[in-house]
């Protein structure tokens, strides 16, 4: 099985590792236009780890600091990075965009489906409340090439999803399987590369193998993901929404194997209950 991948040519996405030595395995991202003159810095939680990994030219290009949600390991570096960027780029106007004023220094709170333009890049803000009420996924489309990606924070991980800190199973089902998928559109699912907030894939794969697809051959898409993880440390930017629909149990709530894993032998549980029980099962691992 070949995953549905496209190499991003005109837009540039630079993953920046944070908190890998302390177990957080976070990502910040620098999203830049083709000419690299305009950029967004997404979830720069750790200034001492992020700033040294940005060149002087990259710092000059940053128009906005952007948060997927307010948790400190995503927004905690807002003010320090803002200060650093303003000192190094006198007179450059830098916005801080987030889902609520709970993120430090936020100057703009976008509405659901509000759009921004960064050069040829169109950014659609998809509000996906559950992990936090202010969670936003940023869906990017290059209007020149058609290339696409999405920054999902702690809403969607490769082969998993975030905990329901400020929502319910129904909320996460709505966020993942209705709001996000509809906003992107079915014709784009195989084009949209996923950039999550954490590198949790290996743990998610272990959970799925232990609790859902226990046998090789039961889900070939999942088997291929498992093999990829054995030889690759990082999975961010390598998989699409269409890939996730093939193996992510939180996006496969009607799959008999998923329902059996949560005790729904008759296949009668509402989707919200399946989602809630699946999250409990994952939390217990």
From Swiss-Prot:
UniProt pathway:
Secondary metabolite metabolism; methylglyoxal degradation; (R)-lactate from methylglyoxal: step 2/2
Cell location:
Mitochondrion matrix
* Span of chain positions assigned to the transit peptide in the UniProt entry: 1-10
Judged by the first EC level, this protein's enzyme class is hydrolase
Q: Does the keyword Zinc apply?
A: yes
Which Pfam family, any one of them, does this sequence belong to?
HAGH_C
GO cellular-component terms in the record? mitochondrial matrix; mitochondrion
Residue ranges the record marks as coiled coil? none
- What UniProt keywords are attached to this protein's entry? Hydrolase, Metal-binding, Mitochondrion, Transit peptide, Zinc
Gene Ontology molecular-function annotations? hydroxyacylglutathione hydrolase activity; metal ion binding
Free-text remark on how the cofactor is bound: Binds 2 Zn(2+) ions per subunit.
The residues that hold Zn(2+) 2 are: 73-74, 154, 198
Q: Which reaction does it catalyse?
A: an S-(2-hydroxyacyl)glutathione + H2O = a 2-hydroxy carboxylate + glutathione + H(+); (R)-S-lactoylglutathione + H2O = (R)-lactate + glutathione + H(+)
EC number(s) recorded for this UniProt protein: 3.1.2.6
**Influence of pH:** Optimum pH is 6.5-9.
Which cofactors does this protein require?
Zn(2+)
Q: What regulation of activity is recorded for this protein?
A: Inhibited by various thiol compounds such as glutathione and coenzyme A.
Function summary: Thiolesterase that catalyzes the hydrolysis of S-D-lactoylglutathione to form glutathione and D-lactic acid. Involved in the metabolism of methylglyoxal, a toxic compound for yeast proliferation, by converting methylglyoxal to lactate via S-D-lactoylglutathione by sequential enzyme reactions catalyzed by glyoxalase I and glyoxalase II.
In which family does this protein belong, per the annotation?
Belongs to the metallo-beta-lactamase superfamily. Glyoxalase II family.
Q: What is this protein called?
A: Hydroxyacylglutathione hydrolase, mitochondrial
Organism expressing this protein natively? Saccharomyces cerevisiae (strain ATCC 204508 / S288c)
